Every structure is written in structure tokens, then in C-alpha cells.
Amino acid sequence: MKFTKMQGIGNDYVYVNCFEEHVEDPARVAQLVSERHFGIGSDGLILICPSEVADCRMRMFNEDGSEGSMCGNGIRCVGKYAYDHGIVDKPQISVETLGGIKYLDMRIEGGKVKTVKVDMGIPQLTSELPEKIQVDGKKLEFTGIDVGNPHAVYYVDDVDSLDLEKIGPAFEMHERFPDRVNSEFIRVIDRRHLQMRV
């Protein structure tokens, strides 16, 4: 199987061009390639596939093999891959996802994609404002937002001291989120600036 590993601000996936390749069991392949010590090491597997309703289709599998609906950083890499490898030949494209069709606007320089902007659609609030959750004996307030996939935004006083490798999975797999959730931890610096860790 030919693959490409790409990352968008550190969110790394293994990408397979399914215009040319076939992946028999993508859930299992995602688990194998995501293993950071014995596999390739990634946050998951993304398949770039033909689509009947868009320029291409993105299927995203998390490192545990579950299929996710969308990933903003992942879809930006899909756009770059699709253009740079000739799947598309225009700077504005549509990509089918489980979270709906997303529209990408790419800046091209020297025949290659330099930046990709994604129209994620209008975010939908998915919880009361704010909602409380308890993890590891700590009660935190969060705001639930859906941008094609679920996010929980937590406001904290100090993002630098957070052990994200420990607390991230605890929030992601919390019973409050039966379909898992992406967690963002935010410190408000002032009215115009935030500090965030994902």
C-alpha cells in the first residue's frame, strides 16, 4: 500500500490515495499505522476517495479504528494532496465528509499548494452554556460546539501546565461524549487574544 504522511499544525495522519489504491479494512489499517512505536505513528488514517457529489471524498479513521466525521487539519492536507498529485486541477474544491460537504480555497505558488482555507460551515452549539464535567476529580466548565465533528472547549487559567497526554483521553472518552470528542483548552489573555492547546 502506498501512503503519504502529512501533518497540519501537528495533527498527523497517514493518507492513502484511493483513486489508485484499495484499503480492504481501513479500521484495522488505521490501528496498525497509528501505532507510534511499531507502526508509522499518526493520529489516524485518511482515505482520499472518488465522490459522486464533490471533487473528492475524505474518510477519516481515528487511531482506535473508529470512523470520524471530519478533521479540519486533516481536510486541509487532503486539499494539498489532491491538488499536488493531480486529483484536482483548480484552487477551489469541494470535499465530501461524514460531516457534510466542505469547501476549500487553496493558494497555489509554483504549481504547489502553499495554504489551504476551509469553510467549516456555521458552528452549532451542542450544550447548555456552560456545561460542567468532572474528570480526574476536577470539575471544569465547557462549551460544546459542532463544526462537522464534536468539540468541547474548556476555559482554564493555565494551559501550559496541562498534561494533555493524560487528561486529553480522559475528556475524549468521558461518558458524557458517547461518540468521543475533540477537546480544546483555552486561556483568555485579553479581549482579542487566547492561548489554546488541543
Can you name each region flagged by the protein language model?
Residues M1-K112, A152-V198:
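A glycine-rich beta-to-alpha transition motif near the start of alpha/beta enzyme domains, typified by
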Residues T4-M6, I93-V95, P130-G137, T143-I145:
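Short acidic-hydrophobic surface loop/beta-edge motif
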Residues G121-E128:
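Ligand-binding beta-strand-loop-alpha-helix segment within the catalytic cores
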Residues K112-M120:
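Short, solvent-exposed secondary-structure boundary/capping segments
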Residues Q134-S161:
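Internal active-site segments that recognize and position negatively charged phosphoryl groups
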Residues E128-L129, K138-E141, A170-E172, N182:
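Glycine-rich, charged/polar anion/phosphate-binding loops
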Residues V118, T143, R197-V198:
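Beta-strand scaffold of nucleotide-dependent catalytic cores
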